């Protein structure tokens, strides 16, 4: 199934309606392989979006999804969902666009993309920016992670306690490592390729670079 978000009521005018429209399209991935295309524009997101298995999310290179809440922008599971091993929502491909955590206007510690208990996760040509204290990507318990030609721009730690935070965290499903969802069953992250990526500040003067590009807390 191919969905153009223009046909789902996406306007860039009302953040509540836009968030609902994108989530409604992503929900189609529960039933069948789905490609969701988000055209050029800036869309304010008022709650975390959940992406399901066998979904390709295509964004125009001038598309911005801008956080207007305190949580993550995108995750592949629900807080009380039962995920273990690599049996979570998998085969998720994200291509293009900008995911703006909007950390100056919403200065809350969180991670842009939280991906856990899954296989075959791909990000190509994606920009993640303006993160407060957290990670651009938290990949925990993933078998097959491919990140290519992505940009990680802009990090600040208002608390002064998260100097160690990485842009890309590769972790193991152990207690405290991945609090968003899933079981802490020791599932490792493996078969990872990260290539041709940029790590640096964003255009905002407050937003510098992460102190570490790639790392892990649990290991």
Model-derived regions: residue spans:
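N-terminal extracellular ligand-recognition/capping segment immediately after the signal peptide
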Residues: 9, 19, 31-73, 77-79, ...
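Short glycine-/Asp-/Thr-/Trp-enriched loop segments that recur within the blades
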Residues: 16, 159-160
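Amphipathic, non-transmembrane alpha-helical secondary structure
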Residues: 23, 27-30, 148, 195
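Flexible, charged surface loops at secondary-structure boundaries
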Residues: 26-32, 50-52, 86-88, 116
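Extracellular beta-strand/beta-solenoid scaffold signature
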Residues: 22, 46, 68-85, 105-114, ...
